[in-house]
């Protein structure tokens, strides 16, 4: 995917994280976009998203949402076991 094809996530859209394993169910690592925000410390746009599945990680922290810089959300992963977008539209 090149820069011209990059789609900014929109509220309500659902994305899979690259760690999604369809064998573990359709909701495994599935997230819904809650909104975009402004990181007042850096001035960068962030993506606010929530898991569609029950996240023990967030529950233990007492949080409801994940937040990532837009650039990281749209980034590509380059690992031995996976090369591709960090998140992809469901």
Give residue spans per PLM region:
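Intrinsically disordered, low-complexity, charged/polar segments
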Residues: 58-90
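Short aromatic-glycine motifs in intrinsically disordered, low-complexity regions
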Residues: 10-25
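Mixed-charge, Lys/Arg-rich low-complexity intrinsically disordered regions
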Residues: 1-11
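Short beta-strand-centered aromatic/proline hotspots
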Residues: 25-38
